[in-house]
């Protein structure tokens, strides 16, 4: 009996430690469905309901634009897939993008079409405590889907010292993320290698998980792209070749190597930054692999000249783990710190979601009105703004004649190449006079940023254009982007529009 009692006494601390581990994982990953958490019964369903309600509100309160890809690489492509009109950018002509992601939205469009419910309001795909997550997560960017799949994958990732992970599930989610956006592989390289290193049955991991998952997802992606491209295209390889190996993304701008460390990561973390640093110092060693994944990802992206905030968005969930661990360690200051984070993120979230850069979307409602009368067949729109500044047919949903300034990169290596948008902005007045040498070529409506108005005012007056709408865009105009967007229409057409 004494021996049995001794064994029982030694087993209790182990069970207590196991319970603590389960609770930590529950806090870290949210314990979906309450299946894997260590909290009270009903806690996870309530948390899930709260999260769904929050994202529903998030969706309603994001009414601004972020970057062109949220429309041009998803909704515009899907619109063309279903309704047979829409614009495909140069990436699609060169096989750098795959149809797997737009197919999600195309399926929704097709259902609406079959139900005869494809009016423009329904075709505005709903863009469902971190301000950057609030700003980005509900957008139709591939980066947002990449981040979402990363979060789900992390919930199944096998942490050292725990047997609660699922190799097949997390590897499947990673594979799906890579199909949608090939750069999703970057943050997972150290995590997968860490898993492989600690895995005792390495051969089983490769033969029973890695190879089957890779073959199924890659095969499905190939078939989907074969159907829509009409030929075999390995878009993931083309994407990596263009953006990583050839580094041709510099055509769209470049930043210094340290930009992600000095601006990118601090901006997307915001007021979470000090908590992130504190959490990195306090977190146990077994969680350092997540910090390594963050550092590795930022370093890799730092080697590429073209940089954007959204590129490192997928590491934000990893950073938030350390922020949460920091709050846990603060104990007496926990509630005050949480209140500070909530209040300090509320203002930038609401401002960027409701006000900043909303003109790009609002102006399309003016364009869409041209579809609602008999004037449609005579109407035409020319968007004289930096290329892809607004959505296109996905937000108009009628075959209206529309045109915009284009800026595809030159893939032939011609160093003297200048795209149409740069040619226009080098001398807008001369470009317009040369392009529209005959009045019959003039569009019925012109759309441009307010900063351009004075420079082309003589052309507008000479050709008989009059301002018909002024749309607010941003409080911080920069370069070619103005504070407002103007809509001009020809005076002779005013009785029809």
For the regions a language model picked out, list residue spans one by one.
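Start-transfer (signal-anchor) and selected internal transmembrane alpha helices
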Residues: 1-57, 209-216
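Signature aromatic-anchored transmembrane alpha helix within multi-pass, membrane-resident enzymes
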Residues: 48-52, 214, 219, 275, ...
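Membrane-interface alpha helices of multi-pass inner-membrane proteins
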Residues: 56-60, 131-137, 151-182, 192, ...
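Short acidic/glycine- and proline-prone juxtamembrane loop motifs at membrane-interface regions
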Residues: 67, 94-97, 135-145, 308-309
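Short hydrophobic/aromatic helix or loop-helix immediately within or flanking a transmembrane segment
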Residues: 73-82, 92-117, 144, 261-265, ...
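Perimembrane helix-loop-helix junctions
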Residues: 155-174, 183-218, 277, 281, ...
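Hydrophobic, aromatic-rich transmembrane alpha-helices
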Residues: 262-286, 298, 320
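Membrane-embedded, lumen/periplasm-facing catalytic core of multi-pass transferases
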Residues: 333-450, 480, 492
């Amino acid at each position: 009996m004494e021996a049995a009692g001794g064994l029982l006494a030694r087993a209790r601390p182990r069970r207590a430690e196991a319970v603590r581990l389960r609770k930590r994982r529950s806090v870290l990953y949210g314990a979906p469905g309450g299946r894997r958490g260590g909290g009270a019964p009903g806690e996870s369903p309530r948390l899930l309901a709260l999260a769904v309600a929050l994202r529903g509100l998030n969706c309603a309160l994001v009414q601004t634009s972020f970057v062109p890809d949220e429309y041009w690489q998803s909704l515009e492509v899907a619109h063309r897939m279903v309704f047979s009109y829409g614009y495909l950018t140069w990436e699609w002509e060169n096989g750098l993008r795959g149809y797997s992601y737009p197919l999600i939205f195309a399926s929704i469009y097709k259902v609406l079409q079959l139900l005869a419910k494809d009016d423009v309001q329904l075709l505005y795909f709903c863009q469902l405590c971190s301000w950057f997550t609030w700003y980005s997560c509900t957008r139709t960017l591939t980066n947002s889907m990449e981040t979402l799949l990363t979060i789900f994958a992390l919930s199944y990732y096998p942490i050292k010292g725990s047997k609660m992970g699922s190799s097949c599930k997390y590897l499947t989610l990673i594979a799906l993320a890579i199909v949608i956006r090939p750069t999703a592989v970057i943050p997972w390289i150290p995590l997968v290698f860490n898993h492989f290193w600690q895995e005792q049955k390495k051969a089983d991991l490769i033969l029973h998980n890695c190879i089957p998952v890779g073959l199924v997802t890659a095969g499905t992606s190939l078939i989907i792209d074969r159907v829509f491209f009409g030929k075999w295209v390995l878009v993931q390889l083309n994407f990596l070749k263009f953006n990583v190996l050839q580094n041709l993304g510099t055509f769209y701008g470049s930043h210094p190597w340290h930009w992600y460390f000095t601006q990118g990561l601090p901006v997307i973390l915001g007021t979470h930054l000090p908590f992130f640093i504190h959490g990195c110092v306090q977190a146990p060693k077994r969680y350092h692999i997540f910090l390594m994944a963050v550092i590795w990802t930022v370093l890799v992206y730092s080697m590429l000249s073209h940089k954007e905030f959204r590129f490192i968005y997928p590491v934000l969930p990893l950073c938030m783990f350390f922020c949460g661990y920091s709050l846990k360690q603060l104990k007496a200051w926990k509630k005050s710190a949480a209140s500070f984070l909530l209040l300090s993120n509320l203002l930038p979230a609401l401002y960027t979601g409701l006000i900043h850069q909303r003109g790009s979307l609002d102006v399309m409602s003016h364009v869409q009105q041209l579809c609602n009368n008999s004037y449609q067949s005579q109407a035409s729109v020319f968007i004289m703004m930096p290329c892809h500044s607004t959505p296109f047919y996905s937000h108009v949903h009628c075959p209206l004649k529309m045109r915009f300034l284009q800026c595809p990169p030159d893939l032939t290596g011609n160093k003297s190449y200048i795209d149409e948008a740069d040619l226009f902005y080098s001398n807008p007045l001369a470009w317009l006079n040369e392009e529209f040498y005959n009045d019959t070529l003039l569009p019925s409506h012109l759309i441009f940023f307010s900063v351009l108005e004075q420079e082309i005012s003589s052309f507008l007056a000479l050709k008989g254009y009059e301002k018909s709408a002024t749309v607010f865009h941003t409080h911080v105009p920069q370069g070619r982007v103005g504070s407002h967007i103007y809509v001009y229409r020809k005076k002779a057409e005013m009785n029809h529009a």
